[in-house]
Regions:
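Short, acidic/small-residue loops that bind anionic groups at enzyme active sites
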Residues: 88-109, 201-223
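Extended, histidine- and acidic-residue-enriched regions that form the cofactor-binding/catalytic faces
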Residues: 7, 164, 171-209, 213, ...
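Short, glycine-/small-residue-rich phosphate/pyrophosphate-handling segment
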Residues: 15-16, 107-145, 221-231
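N-terminal beta-loop-helix "entrance" segment that forms/cooperates
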Residues: 36-57, 151-158
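Glycine-rich, highly charged phosphate/nucleotide-binding loops
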Residues: 48-65, 164-172
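Active-site rim beta-loop-alpha module in soluble metabolic enzymes
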Residues: 124, 131-189, 197
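Short beta-strand segments enriched in small/hydrophobic residues
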Residues: 1-19, 113-116
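Glycine/small-residue-rich loop that forms an oxyanion/phosphate-binding "nest" at active or ligand-binding sites
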Residues: 60-105, 109
Length: 231
């Protein structure tokens, strides 16, 4: 099984993250599954709707090329899922949105969802996203870390102190969500998702933290297998 993972990060700007992401995904992939991680240049650096649209167009082009190259599934490895429905209308292979897959998975773990996103600019986007997926009434609150992709570089390059600081910042943002009633915490971005990837059993109070990177990959594997079974 070959899976194409579309990141919205530029490998030349944040090489440690891209290397760690590729290593992580291929390590947790099922036997016989390979994951190819591709970035976007220029990346989604100036957060906002126009940048999301621009990157979505590039992702759609890459998705078409991936299917033509024989990939079995395409993962929109960007939690906001821009262009997700357009890609599904274009490709025959399964197309998985990290945001959609994670929100649906989290809704099976608890009733009230709290999201920690990279930047406050995405807060409204995630509320709209939850509404689009039929989960609008399940989201308690969305809060932003106020980070950019490059802020994670040291942690992904192996700096343990930087990793610990980022985890501490994430937990500090997530705690008020739990205090407001969230019983599941979602890192609304693959960057923070990968950050907590090695924190097995991570919880904020009683609320489990869902690893969106793992959920997206395993969803893609599942849909490829279901397609093989059912056509």
């Amino acid at each position: 099984m070959r899976i194409f993972w579309q990141s919205f990060v530029d490998a030349s700007v944040n090489a440690p993250y891209m290397a760690r992401l590729s290593e992580y995904l291929n390590n947790i992939a099922a036997p016989g599954t390979t994951v190819q991680v591709e970035g976007i240049s220029p990346p989604d650096r100036e957060f906002g709707r126009l940048a999301e649209l621009r990157c979505a167009v590039q992702a759609i082009d890459n998705g078409i090329a991936a299917e033509e190259s024989g990939f079995d599934a395409f993962v929109m490895g960007h939690f906001q899922d821009p262009g997700l429905y357009e890609l599904r209308s274009t490709l025959d292979i399964p197309v998985v949105g990290t945001g959609e897959a994670t929100l649906l998975a989290a809704s099976q773990l608890g009733r009230r969802l709290g999201l920690v996103t990279l930047d406050p600019v995405f807060e409204v986007w995630h509320y709209e996203q939850a509404e689009r997926y039929g989960l609008g009434d399940r989201v308690v609150h969305v809060t932003g870390l106020g980070c950019k992709p490059e802020d994670f570089a040291a942690a992904f390059a192996g700096d343990q102190a930087a990793h610990a600081r980022m985890i501490e910042d994430f937990l500090a943002c997530a705690l008020p969500l739990v205090e407001r009633g969230a019983d599941v915490v979602i890192p609304a971005g693959v960057l923070p998702g990968l950050l907590i990837g090695r924190e097995r059993g991570l919880k904020v109070g009683h609320a489990p933290v869902v690893n969106c990177a793992a959920v997206a990959l395993k969803s893609a594997e599942m849909w490829v297998q279901l397609r093989q079974l059912n056509g």
